[in-house]
Amino acid sequence: MTSKNSIQKALYLAFERLQWSELRDSVPLTLSEQDLENLRGINEKISLSEVTDIYLPLSRLLNLIVKAKQQRGLVVDEFLGQKPSRSPYIISIAGSVAVGKSTTARILQALLRHWPEHPKVDLVTTDGFLYPLADLKRKGLLQRKGFPESYDMKMLVEFISAVKSGQPHVKAPIYSHVTYDRVKNQHQTVSQPDILILEGLNVLQTGLDSPVDTRRPFVSDFVDFSIYVDAEEPLLKQWYKERFLQFRSGAFSDKKSYFHHYSSLTDDEANTIAANIWDTINGPNLQLNIQPTRERAHLILQKGQDHLMSHVLMRK
């Protein structure tokens, strides 16, 4: 049987942290400590050195790739004798709950905006494409929230297709982590960005993963470059529990919060409930639907203790 390590060696170039950091090639750091503070997620200790060592080389790589795609587009337009077309470069960021996808996406957005070739960088999370809470309850999917079947994939694919085709104004639904639901009558408008970053649990899924229809398009069909943020499951579970405990005095403390009843839990009670949520929902979703898509990514960011990147794997 082929091992995971042998597959990764065949598909990827592997870099230790120091090796990867040397590929920065004098790209300037454009973020301050205050900028970084605004970009951090709950329970993440990311530092400017993490940005310098990991994200600056990655932003340089993406800049080179996007420029090459733009040049190729100009060649095709010239060959066809047509005016230059405007098709955004789409980057997807996948990974488990609590791995830090959102922080990775926000940092990349901030860095990529500083390159003159692509100053307009939009970020959309797939959370907004979860079915509304009432629909999830009606379909009996509340305990499957985050699983592929809990998303309105038709709406998501239509959105990403419209953005990719260059439509001038495309609306994406907005999700509230307070109400645990899609926000009614509010949208994020995406207007022909140079780059769109799409962040979510299952953005690497393909037709091969679908139990329903393997022929219909999937989000991954529209993505130009994909990133998977990885960590060992015991770490992910630990980070999820720590984040859950912090939410008690944060999001859960809001009386409008769907989870307000958790705000008064003791540490032991909160740990028990968080562990149960992981074991029954987030863990199985990771094992069944998210982790199996990892080797489809163009780049894998591997995290160790304290959310620090330890290795980077780049597709050959």
Curated annotation (Swiss-Prot):
Compartmental location: Cytoplasm
One GO MF term: ATP binding
Superkingdom: Bacteria
Gene Ontology biological-process entries: coenzyme A biosynthetic process
Pfam families in alphabetical order: PRK
EC number: 2.7.1.33
Matching Gene3D superfamilies: P-loop containing nucleotide triphosphate hydrolases
Residues the record lists as binding ATP: G95, S96, V97, A98, V99, G100, K101, S102
UniProt pathway annotation: Cofactor biosynthesis; coenzyme A biosynthesis; CoA from (R)-pantothenate: step 1/5
Entry similarity comment: Belongs to the prokaryotic pantothenate kinase family.
Name of the protein: Pantothenate kinase
Gene designation: coaA
